[in-house]
UniProtKB/Swiss-Prot annotation:
This is ATP-dependent RNA helicase HAS1. Residues 52-121, 576-607 are annotated as: Disordered. Residues 81-92 have a biased composition (Basic and acidic residues). It comes from Cryptococcus neoformans var. neoformans serotype D (strain B-3501A). Signal peptide: none annotated. The gene is HAS1. Gene3D superfamilies: P-loop containing nucleotide triphosphate hydrolases. It is found in: Nucleus, Nucleolus. The keyword Transcription regulation does not apply. GO terms for biological process: rRNA processing. Belongs to the DEAD box helicase family. DDX18/HAS1 subfamily. Residues 350-519 form the Helicase C-terminal domain. A motif (DEAD box) lies at residues 283-286. One of its GO terms (molecular function) is ATP binding.
Length: 607
């Protein structure tokens, strides 16, 4: 775009909001628990305390000779005993949202005991169990020390010992609990103990729902396997398939893969040796199924050898489909581990959560004001569509609010570069779709902003899981229209505690006229704004909670103003399910046109 078109948007003078009320009761309770724990420790009755690290990685290996791995009879047995300024907030009244819950409300799914098998004891104290108690191989122990981990998280302390003992595990743990290390350590130890070599082919396969999560797991595996001789690699859509195939033929002992690309290689890559597979890990199983890979997973399970294979399945939620996948992938009677079943909240304890109610035409100005105030923080902003991310990133960068953007329509190299740039940045703003909402371990995120609300409380939980990880604190803010307040009832059922945040109107930068002038004069931004506006309506029309998110009740004049239009443009939107097509896209694009069933919207603002 030409620089002469540039029109700067001026903001109000320096502003701030009142500091949040502190919860003294929680602080006193924590002090009391620390004193009690110290007393128990003195008496020798306390096993452990809350670990300070979240993402730990570990490996277990078994001996292997020539081309055929020996049987794994000598498995090591382990016992499993069992400053930034924030808006003022207020607790909303219980009767403030008058919404009748109906059959569309997501209900907690249960799993069959026949599938789950034995349960590890949830009442056992697993705090501060050191990794040194696991008797891991020297290379793995050294790698864990280099990574800065000393003690295990609860999911690691409850999962790693039975996995080292060769058991199958079905694990349920909230995001940020350290489960990546929980399955990587036994996997690496397994390959090491079996002395896998490239000629033996693949011994461990780890399946991940998204490319970004696959890259992250691969990065952790790389650190963990630094002192080992085994080979490792990643397979994912968007990467060079021929280069992947060449490496597979040479022999890759540990593979991290997305479902579609893995199935492709299993079916079509000659020379890919996976007959010696000894461990299968399915991470974020619920998400894999949600985005439409149920049939691919069934085919993968059918193609992989099951004899003498250890399997691990991790899922944040236990749905019927997850249970069915566990039934076909795990051996009978797996150990079921749920580290969250005794917790009162579904989100992290150190997470401060709030929501703000504002009309559509105030949304961008409030977001702009918030981001300007938090430029020195690390912030992730979630949108419902790729085009909306693209438009807001172009606009904010144009008006001197530097941001990064990440969504499913970007080429893989762009996504990868953006992902690692944000991870390594001490501060910054990332605009994204739900492609970044699951499993990714992004350090030191201060704020999660859900500019477009999710359609399901589970998606809300996964989004806010990008902050307050590994015992650290974090904050989240959910934007809601007045008509969307009923969503709070669903969050309450899902055990998500929120306070209402109030932003003083005089503190919000009134840049509407400048925004409309810029969009009307800059052709490039105008086109991008039109695409973002259309995609926002498409995504809204695809929401399943129609009584709360009803596209026909939107004030389009106000929605148009949020995208910089004095008069909302005429656009065609698909009122079919965006998710239906999205589910087939391994990119996890949140902005697909769906089927060509069209509705026409123009100038339908409320009087």
């Amino acid at each position: 775009m030409e620089r002469r078109d540039r029109m700067r948007i001026s903001t109000a003078q320096k502003f701030g909001w009142g500091s949040q009320a502190q919860t003294g009761r929680r602080f006193v309770l924590r002090i009391f628990m620390v004193i009690l724990s110290l007393e128990k420790l003195r008496q020798g009755s306390l096993l452990c305390m809350t670990p300070s690290h979240g993402n730990a990685h570990s490996s277990a290996h078994r001996a292997m000779s020539s081309t055929k791995p020996p049987t794994t009879t000598n498995k090591r047995k382990r016992t499993s005993n069992a400053h930034d300024e924030a808006p003022a907030k207020r607790v909303p009244e219980a009767s403030s949202s008058k919404v009748t819950l109906d059959d569309s409300q997501p209900a907690p799914a249960t799993s069959s005991d026949a599938v789950l098998g034995a349960r590890s004891a949830p009442g056992t104290d697993y705090e501060r169990v050191p990794f040194s108690t696991l008797n891991l191989s020297p290379p793995t122990t050294a790698a864990i020390e280099r990574m800065g981990f000393e003690t295990m998280t609860e999911v690691q302390a409850r999962t790693i010992p039975p996995l080292l003992a060769g058991k199958d595990v079905l694990g349920a743990a909230r995001t940020g609990s350290g489960k990546t290390m929980a399955f990587l350590i036994p996997s690496v130890e397994l390959l090491s103990t079996l002395r896998f070599k490239p000629v033996n082919g693949t011994g461990v396969i780890i399946i991940s729902p998204t490319r970004e999560l696959a890259l992250q797991i691969f990065g952790v595996a790389k650190e963990l396997m630094q002192g080992h001789s085994q080979t490792f690699g990643v397979l994912m859509g968007g990467a060079n398939r021929k280069a992947e195939a060449d490496k597979l033929v040479k022999g890759v002992n540990l593979i991290v893969a997305t479902p579609g690309r893995l199935l492709d290689h299993l079916q079509n890559t000659k020379g890919f040796v996976f007959k010696n597979l000894k461990a299968l890990v399915i991470d974020e199983a619920d998400r894999i199924l949600e985005i439409g890979f149920e049939e691919e997973m069934k085919q993968i399970i059918k193609l992989l050898p099951s004899e003498n294979r250890q399997s691990m399945l991790f899922s944040a939620t236990q749905t019927t489909k997850v249970t069915d996948l566990a039934r076909i992938s795990l051996r009978p009677g797996p150990l079921y581990i749920n580290v969250d079943e005794t917790k009162e909240a579904s989100t992290a304890d150190m997470l401060e959560q709030g929501y703000v109610v504002c009309e559509s035409d105030q949304r961008f100005m409030l977001l702009f004001t918030f981001l300007k105030k938090n430029l020195k923080k690390k912030v992730i902003v979630f949108f419902s569509s790729c085009n909306s991310v693209k438009y807001h990133a172009e606009l904010l960068n144009y008006i001197d609010v530097p941001v990064l953007d990440l969504h499913g329509k970007q080429k893989q190299q762009k996504r990868t570069n953006t992902f690692f740039e944000f991870i390594n940045a001490p501060a910054g703003i990332l605009l994204c779709t739900d492609v970044a909402a699951r499993g990714l371990d992004i350090p030191k995120v201060d704020w999660i902003i859900q500019f477009d609300p999710p359609d399901d409380p589970r998606d809300y939980i996964h989004r806010v899981g990008r902050t307050a990880r590994a015992g650290k604190s974090g904050k989240s803010l959910l934007f809601l229209l007045p008509s969307e307040l009923g969503f709070l009832r669903f969050l309450k059922v899902a055990k998500v505690p929120l306070n209402e945040y109030q932003f003083p109107q005089k503190k919000v930068a009134d840049v509407q006229k400048q925004l409309e002038s810029l969009i009307s004069k800059n052709h490039y931004l105008n086109t991008s704004a039109r695409d973002g506006y259309r995609s926002y309506l498409q995504a809204y029309a695809s929401y399943s909670l129609k009584k709360i998110f009803d596209v026909n009740k939107l004030d389009l004049a106000k929605v148009g103003k949020a995208f910089g239009f004095a008069v909302p443009p005429k656009v065609n939107i698909s009122v079919g399910s965006v998710k239906a097509k999205k589910s087939r896209d391994e990119d996890e694009s949140s902005d697909d046109d769906g089927q060509p069933k069209k509705a026409y919207y123009r100038n339908r603002g409320r009087k």
